[in-house]
Amino acid sequence: MIEQTLDIATGDGEMETFICRPERGPFPAVFLLMDAPGIREELKDMARRLGTVGYYVLLPNLYYRAGRDTIYGPSVLEEGSAERGRMRAVRSKMSIPPVMNDIAGMLAFADRQKEVRRGPAGFVMATA
């Protein structure tokens, strides 16, 4: 299994993205979009599980526009915590059109990777 964190070019800058994939390839790409609490170890574990069954998984930090300090601690899941308040302040500034542009950047990136095989993609983003 290969794991790496890369910056993917978007219209608004460089989007930090966790990538997990088996060796060799090509493999179908999965865009694993974070939920409201953002990137955390549980989501990386989901990416790893998908990678072990033959997918090239991209897990982008969709909060990258607010800076690199948008990876929150475990208390982000606790109502009333300072981390949750920080996350909500960033999340409240998000809108769909920029995220769709981020997806376009991810598609362009995936299209350039020899380890990625073209195929359908699915998207989900929940809220906290």
List PLM regions with ranges.
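N-terminal cap/leader regions of alpha/beta-hydrolase-fold enzymes
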Residues: M1-A128
